[in-house]
């Protein structure tokens, strides 16, 4: 099946989740800023409510950007993983919809939708390269974050270019190097403690 056929059931399910049928819904997520601002904007646009839990060290500017969309947002005393657990707990307690780009067993559908959204960035890159008669890049440098952006981008390039996929480097703060540690150990390895980095939005 082509992209259109594969996309159809996902699109129908997404429509059910975000539709206004049954009244306003409440979406909740953990965020360090960018993801949350987008969710807050979409919730406001569609007439829904949104709640955000931000990890300690998040900037006041990002907090206020989210609140400016009419959302409830607070900076917690948790690191990013702790904020995710809090958002998940509050979703279960209150019947809210968790919109998280971090996946775990039993919570994979919505993160997959978010990754599908990220693939539009790759499609824009392909389109602009073709429009300007430019060659495909030889190297990709991608932020790690929680892995969804990097996975979506690398997957898009690998699916399109196959063996000609660019050499790819995934970059993360040295205080939040869980992907690096996991790759070295061969098993999922969390990072605990304070994640002090000038790239606070990537300390997840």
Regions flagged by a language model, labelled:
Residues 10-29, 37-90, 179-190:
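Active-site-proximal loop->helix
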Residues 27-33, 142-146, 172:
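Active-site nucleophile and cofactor-binding loops and adjacent substrate-binding regions
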Residues 97-161:
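Active-site/ligand-binding-proximal alpha/beta "capping" segment
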Residues 1-27, 109-130:
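Glycine-rich oxoanion-binding loops at beta->alpha junctions
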Residues 51, 74, 97-99, 141, ...:
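Hydrophobic/aromatic beta-strand patches that form the interior of the parallel beta-sheet core
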Residues 33-35, 43, 66, 125, ...:
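Buried hydrophobic positions in well-ordered alpha/beta secondary-structure cores of metabolic enzymes
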Residues 81-88, 95-107, 159-204:
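Active-site/ligand-binding loops adjacent to catalytic centers
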Residues 48-62, 139, 160-175:
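Short, acidic/small-residue loops that bind anionic groups at enzyme active sites
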């Amino acid at each position: 099946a082509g992209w259109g056929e594969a996309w159809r059931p996902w699109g129908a399910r997404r429509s059910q989740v975000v539709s206004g049928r049954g009244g306003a819904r409440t979406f909740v997520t953990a965020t360090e800023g960018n993801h949350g601002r987008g969710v807050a904007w979409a919730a406001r646009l569609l007439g829904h409510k949104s709640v955000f839990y931000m990890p300690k060290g998040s900037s006041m500017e990002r907090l206020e950007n989210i609140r400016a969309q009419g959302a409830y947002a607070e900076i917690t005393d948790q690191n990013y993983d702790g904020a995710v657990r809090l958002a998940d707990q509050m979703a279960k307690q209150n019947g809210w919809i968790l919109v998280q780009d971090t996946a775990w067993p039993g919570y994979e559908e919505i993160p997959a939708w978010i990754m599908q959204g990220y693939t539009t960035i790759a499609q824009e890159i392909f389109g602009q390269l073709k429009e300007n008669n430019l060659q495909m890049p030889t190297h990709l440098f991608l932020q790690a974050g929680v892995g969804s952006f990097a996975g979506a981008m690398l997957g898009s390039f690998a699916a399109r270019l196959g063996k000609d996929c660019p050499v790819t480097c995934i970059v993360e703060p040295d205080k939040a190097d869980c992907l690096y540690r996991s790759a070295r150990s061969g098993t999922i390895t969390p990072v605990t403690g304070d994640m002090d980095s000038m790239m606070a939005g990537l300390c997840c």
